[in-house]
Amino acid sequence: MVDALNVGVNLEAFSQAIHCIQALRSSVTRVFDCLKDGMKNKESQEARERTFVSEFQDNLHSVNGDLNELERLSNLVGKPSENLPLHNSGLLSLDPVHDKTPLYSQLLQAYKWSNKLQFHAGLASGLLNQQSLKRSAIQMGVSTKRRPKVQPTTLALPPQYIDDVISRIDRMFPEMTIQLSRPNGSSAILLVILGKVLKVIVVMRSLFIDRTIVKGYTENVYTEDGKLDIWSKSNYQVFQKVTDHATTALLHYQLPQMPDVVVRSFMTWLRSYIKLFQAPCQRCGKFLQDGLPPTWRDFRTLESFHDSCRQ
């Protein structure tokens, strides 16, 4: 009885209600049996009718009595407590519907993200290995007087030296025109025109390439005041893709001790876009994929690939 009070249910009335339901079902069954059997064989028609009506009324009174008793017991049973502890079964409603869970799309996105992370981690590892930043206990024990001091001379190169390097690179590639300007002091900005394919704005800091912006050959690269526009992107998706690949190339071609080699290597890689709309993809052999030509160029072989085919 204590448990019944705790949950708010009268178990004795509940048990009596179950027996009452069984009695009600039996009463209803007798009513239908009476209708099924009909009038029994008697001596006269009137006697048969009186017997049938009497039995049918008795059965209906029995059904009515059982139904009233069931209603009375249902009021005594009570309602279960709303604070009934469900424990872990109360968490079943929080489970997602498997048919509506975007499991495949989430796994595919995670797989692509993992591949890109592995690719960029490999690039970062190669760059760190080129920097030669290894330190050992022997090097830490060397006296500071005997250590060779490396002067950061490459950070402040004379403008004449930078002009000579750019001029030599300009003569190396006849189909490429390089215009050098210094609108903001000593830092140089290059406007590279590659045939009739594209234009590239190269922002330099001394002899180090800071950023690049690739635009179409027919696009305007100047602002309203006549200066090179180093901020706005191209209006075409194909050249936006090439801009992203050029930024990746800047991270690949890193050699702080020889910045002129870096600039020459980058210009050699950039020159491979002279056949941007003519070279097919080396992986699938198609010229267009999703409406775009092969925008990726391999850093070593300079072969053309679609962005999705290079992985």
Swiss-Prot record:
The keyword Transmembrane does not apply. GO terms for cellular component: mediator complex. It comes from the Eukaryota. The keyword Ligase does not apply. GO terms for biological process: regulation of transcription by RNA polymerase II. Keywords: Activator, Nucleus, Transcription, Transcription regulation. Pfam families: Med27. One of its GO terms (molecular function) is transcription coactivator activity. It is found in: Nucleus. Its main location: nucleus. Belongs to the Mediator complex subunit 27 family. Component of the Mediator complex. Component of the Mediator complex, a coactivator involved in the regulated transcription of nearly all RNA polymerase II-dependent genes. Mediator functions as a bridge to convey information from gene-specific regulatory proteins to the basal RNA polymerase II transcription machinery. Mediator is recruited to promoters by direct interactions with regulatory proteins and serves as a scaffold for the assembly of a functional preinitiation complex with RNA polymerase II and the general transcription factors. This is Mediator of RNA polymerase II transcription subunit 27-B. It comes from Xenopus laevis (African clawed frog).
